[in-house]
Amino acid sequence: MNFSDVMREESKWTKTENGADAKNTTDSALLDMFATIGSMRNRSEDEIIQKFELAFQEDPLGAMRCLFWARDCRGGAGERRVFRVLLPYIANKHTDAMMKNLNSIPEYGRWDDFYSLIDTPVEDEVWERIKLILDTDSILMEQGKSCTLLAKWLKKADASSPNTRKLGIYTAKKLGMSVYDYKRLCVKLRRYIDVVEQRMSANEWDTINYPAVPSRAMMNYRKAFARHDQERFDEYLNKVQSGEQKINSSTLYPYDIVEKILYGHEDSKVLEVQWDNLPDYVDGDVNAVVMADVSGSMSGRPMATSIGLAMYFAERNKGAYHNLFMTFSESPQFVTVKGNTITQKINFISKVDWGYNTDLEKALLKILDVAIENYCSQEEMPKSLIIISDMEIDCCTNQKHRENFYDYVSRVYDEHGYKIPNVVFWNVDSRHDVFLADKDRKGVQLVSGQSASTFKNLIGCVDKTPVEMMYSVLNSDRYQAIQI
């Protein structure tokens, strides 16, 4: 290896916030994007754009599919900000790629994502499509048939927010309508598709069809429903608990519920039934353990995400590790989930020892120590360890110079006669580029985000490399509509 090769290799190394050696790339720009895009809510727009552009140069189709996976609120990461940061950039820099995928925007996201494309080369095409859909919805409404939710997400020309009102007036202009006609049509369509906010504004609380209220609206308005329509709302929730009625939870994430209990100290029947009705992405008996980072750097939403995902998986896993997970900070602990309600369970977990360190080394070696002390065979070990963290781990005790974290832990397991289980590094708060394994490490997967739907992608990927797992997601049937 000549000096330039050494320099090139050295440029790939960085330090975590706690001083551990780590890579700043997986050696695949697309994987760098996939492994962080679900957890980049607090990164700058320039960082987000640079990451996408490098991925696009490496694999244009993969980058576009990763973009829509990131936005996908049902099967993907459900990240709105990152998607809206990238839409205008792609429309300006890769216009053809954006034009070919315009129709997919409301399929994976929402109709109001289109507003991010104002003042770009595809804006005229956007308004043509919106006008066509709006005209079609008007006809379908007159015929008493089902129509889209476009009217729900079009900006109101009489909104209280100046920016929203400005966009609403602009929308009317671009659709060739007077503000009055635009407002009248939107109100008519919103009432027809039964947008719950319309009934709330009209003080028609006793006419709200609670089983039809969308997931996030039910969460956001739960206190208003209880305040204005208490008897009927309580009756509805009791019927949900008994299985007579349904409640929508499909677009919620575990942290949505956990943070309201963990930080808001709320004990709500709505949160209880929505937790119970989250989509189940865990396929029965799964031989895996979640390791939840509860260190100081995870405070706020990342902590709620870590605890929420760990509880979600432990509850729904019907195998040997049902209701079991592990926390790690200064001292790793095995946790058995206790309690009858989600509030009781979170209150119990909040009493577990949460420290300020991020000692992932100690946590992974505790798994090894337990196996050694109890003479466990390889077959008795968990098949997979799912590590949910910001990846800002502590410096390891015996890690060699320029030895990546996964390679170090794998070496320690080997020295004691064990093979390290499959490891998933799940990043929930990517503050800068830190990767604990590269793209070719067999038995490692790199994922990101807050969504429990990621579990379904992990179940069948044990022993795959990070790149293999990524492409199993991006090239799945769900993203075949995205083309270049």
Which residues fall in each region the model found?
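Long lumenal/extracellular ectodomains of secretory and single-pass membrane proteins
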Residues: M1-T305, E315-I484
